[in-house]
Regions:
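Aromatic- and Lys/Arg-enriched surface recognition patch
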Residues: 136-145
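Glycine-rich, flexible loop/turn motifs
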Residues: 24-27, 124, 139
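N-terminal capping segments
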Residues: 1-64, 157-160
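Low-complexity, Gly/Ser/Thr/Pro-rich intrinsically disordered linker/tail segments
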Residues: 144-161
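...with weaker cross-activation on analogous glycine-rich loops/strands in unrelated enzymes
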Residues: 3-8, 59-137
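Positively charged, low-complexity intrinsically disordered regions
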Residues: 28, 70, 82, 146-149
Length: 161
């Protein structure tokens, strides 16, 4: 099984997790503990992604890159640039992107999620995102399935292992 598939499965296993207080709760603390910041009441969408990558790597086995530990959505781009070429950053141009299941999808509005599909004919991608809500906010209350249009995507991180 590919690392990308394991990342998607890790995200799917978390759907339905909800905060028990603003930006907090037992499971949210688990996500936040995957970053370099101390656990606290701070936005955790990137921490959720870090957690999913870490969970997938634990099943996949050794990888040649350092795990992401950032607490910022756009900082994941910097992490990607700092690791070896088994992790690739793809910047979108004019709304054109190639998204695959298990990719990290970084949005223009400083939010991030995990793709669970490729783009459909309308340019939409299914994702799972932490710290969102049913309306799609970047500051929400849990882990949700979302559908986003490619026009909202800033960049994509792809794993080649």
């Amino acid at each position: 099984m590919t690392l990308r598939e394991l990342i998607a499965q890790a995200a799917e296993a978390e759907v339905g997790v909800r905060e028990t207080k603003t930006n907090g709760g037992k499971r949210i603390a688990d996500y936040q503990s995957c970053t370099w910041l101390p656990v606290g009441a701070w936005p955790w969408c990137a921490a959720f992604v870090d957690f999913c990558v870490k969970s997938a790597v634990e099943k996949f086995g050794p990888v040649t890159f350092a795990l992401p530990r950032t607490a910022g959505a756009w900082d994941l781009e910097n992490w990607c640039r700092s690791v070896d070429d088994t992790v690739k950053l793809k910047k979108t141009k004019q709304g054109i992107a190639t998204v695959q299941r298990g990719d990290i999808v970084i949005y223009k509005f400083s939010h991030v999620g995990i793709a669970t599909s490729s783009l459909d004919d309308d340019g939409d991608v299914s994702t799972i995102e932490g710290n969102t809500n049913s309306a799609g906010s970047r500051e929400g209350d849990g882990v949700y399935r979302r559908t986003r249009n490619v026009s909202q995507i800033r960049s994509i991180i792809k794993f080649t292992q």
